[in-house]
Amino acid sequence: LRAHTEQFGHQGLVANTDAANDYLQAHDHALNYAKLNRHLIGHRMMEQIHTQGTVITDVNHNLVEPCELYNQQGWLHRKGATPAHHDIVVIPGSRGDHSYLVKPIISELSLHSLPHGAGRKWMRTECKGRLSHRFTPLQLSRTALGSRIICANKQLIYEEAPQSYKSIETVIESMRSLGLIEVIA
């Protein structure tokens, strides 16, 4: 992405050109890298709890893919979003919230997409200023759910604090009331 923006800025690319094909090849490589990382994390987690498992869903987010909307073919860039054309999708909560397993209901209203999580309340650059007078890094290293956060980066622990995110329950209820999902778990 850095090489692309250095050369083209934030301008779009014309489909089927060398530049577009180069971008998509690098994009697909990044998606594959992310998939392998997810599988490695899952494998390591299962090893730690001495169990085995089967992948039931593996969905990318933050991607570009061809899409037809309103009878028009084009490209859809999902930033902070995940495709809705899968059987089941995980909508992650923040470090302080539960995550949800949902069945998407495809809709052009949502651009065939669902949010990838609750979304931020504040920009990353604002988090430490808003939270450091209320919480120490040590206090943020434990969540309301009892999780332990291991993070040596004191800026990042504020950026990713549960307080920096919207409530996942509100986001899930909004999608459910709009008919975009069925909650599974």
Locations of regions flagged by a protein language model:
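Domain-length cofactor-binding catalytic modules of enzymes
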Residues: 1-185
